[in-house]
Curated annotation (Swiss-Prot):
<feature type="binding site">
    <location>
        <begin position="153"/>
        <end position="160"/>
    </location>
    <ligand>
        <name>ADP</name>
    </ligand>
</feature>
<dbReference type="GO" id="GO:0016776">
    <property type="term" value="F:phosphotransferase activity, phosphate group as acceptor"/>
</dbReference>
<keyword id="KW-0418">Kinase</keyword>
<comment type="function">
    <text>Bifunctional serine/threonine kinase and phosphorylase involved in the regulation of the pyruvate, phosphate dikinase (PPDK) by catalyzing its phosphorylation/dephosphorylation.</text>
</comment>
<dbReference type="InterPro" id="IPR026565">
    <property type="entry name" value="PPDK_reg"/>
</dbReference>
<comment type="similarity">
    <text>Belongs to the pyruvate, phosphate/water dikinase regulatory protein family. PDRP subfamily.</text>
</comment>
<keyword id="KW-0808">Transferase</keyword>
<protein>
    <recommendedName>
        <fullName>Putative pyruvate, phosphate dikinase regulatory protein</fullName>
        <ecNumber>2.7.11.32</ecNumber>
        <ecNumber>2.7.4.27</ecNumber>
    </recommendedName>
</protein>
<dbReference type="GO" id="GO:0004674">
    <property type="term" value="F:protein serine/threonine kinase activity"/>
</dbReference>
<keyword id="KW-0547">Nucleotide-binding</keyword>
<dbReference type="InterPro" id="IPR005177">
    <property type="entry name" value="Kinase-pyrophosphorylase"/>
</dbReference>
<dbReference type="Pfam" id="PF03618">
    <property type="entry name" value="Kinase-PPPase"/>
</dbReference>
<dbReference type="GO" id="GO:0005524">
    <property type="term" value="F:ATP binding"/>
</dbReference>
<keyword id="KW-0723">Serine/threonine-protein kinase</keyword>
<dbReference type="GO" id="GO:0043531">
    <property type="term" value="F:ADP binding"/>
</dbReference>
Length: 279
């Protein structure tokens, strides 16, 4: 049994965007306020090779596995691995489909992602997801100008899950870590098109989250700079100075959920777009 304040890994595996899984899992996780889910979202898993990469991550960080996969072989392989490593797994749409089949007397078409109308909005979301996954954690900084939003922040300010959440809303989102002693990518200094949002949290909150992260990985919570109070405080101050220097929007995420953070960013983006249209 998990104790108050502890973390568990939650793996969400989908052959489509993963939005259904995210919505359902967060609605349930919200009922357990004293424990925190470390989300691992795997959208567009449609081949054995893609699934193998997912299974490797699940094996490295066992936890609850929820999935929306329609391909029988992929389902069987996922369930077998989860059973092998004693990770509970559940198909979110499986029981619902069984109920429909029993009532309608007909089987499903088996079309992956059939719940999504193939319109411009759908393809926009897929494009945003692909972009965000390619530009996670400071990767491919040469493509930052193509983003709608660029998130920056020190470690454990929820940059990646916020990026994925925004991408599920069709917003191309990149994120770049701010690391003490490492210069920021020069591309960040000259961005024109994207909204750059600097995510901040209190040193106390960061230390708590980082300690729990280390414990979840089986690492000791020593006095290294990652969780040292003075070092973390210096990180926060440096991030604020960079934000002021480059005119990035500041957003305190200390007491915000991912949904609340994303909503605030979407409002900033909408306000910015309205301002530009009026100029």
């Amino acid at each position: 049994m998990l104790t108050d304040g502890s973390y568990f890994h939650l793996h969400l595996v989908s052959d489509s965007t993963g939005e259904t899984l995210i919505t359902v899992s967060r609605a349930v996780a919200a009922q357990y306020a004293n424990v925190n889910a470390v989300e691992h979202v795997y959208p567009l898993v449609r081949s054995q090779k893609q699934l193998d990469r997912v299974l490797q991550e699940i094996e490295e960080s066992p936890g609850i596995v929820l999935f929306t996969l329609l391909e029988g072989e992929l389902v069987a392989r996922l369930e077998a691995k989860c059973q092998e490593i004693n990770s509970p797994s559940l198909s979110i749409i499986g029981p619902v489909m069984q109920l429909f089949e029993a009532y309608l007397g007909a089987s499903t078409t088996g079309r992956v992602g059939a719940q999504h109308t193939l319109n411009a909005e759908y393809f926009k979301r897929i494009d945003a997801l692909n972009y965000s996954m390619m530009h996670d954690d400071g990767q491919h900084v040469e493509g930052l100008e193509e983003a709608d939003v660029v998130l920056v922040g020190v470690s454990r300010t929820s940059k990646t899950p916020t990026s994925i959440y925004l991408a599920n809303r069709g917003i191309r989102t990149a994120n770049v870590p701010l690391v003490a002693g490492i210069p920021i990518p020069h591309q960040l200094e000259t961005l024109k098109k994207p909204l750059v949002v600097s995510l901040h949290a209190s040193p106390e909150r960061l230390i708590q989250v980082r300690q729990n992260r280390l414990l979840s990985l089986g690492a000791g919570a020593g006095n290294d700079s990652y969780i040292d109070r003075q070092s973390v405080t210096d990180e926060v101050l440096l991030a604020r100075k960079l934000s002021a220097k480059y005119g990035w929007s500041l957003l305190d995420v200390t007491r915000r959920s991912i949904e609340e953070t994303a909503a605030a960013i979407m409002k900033l983006l909408a306000d910015r777009q309205r301002q530009r249209m009026s100029e």
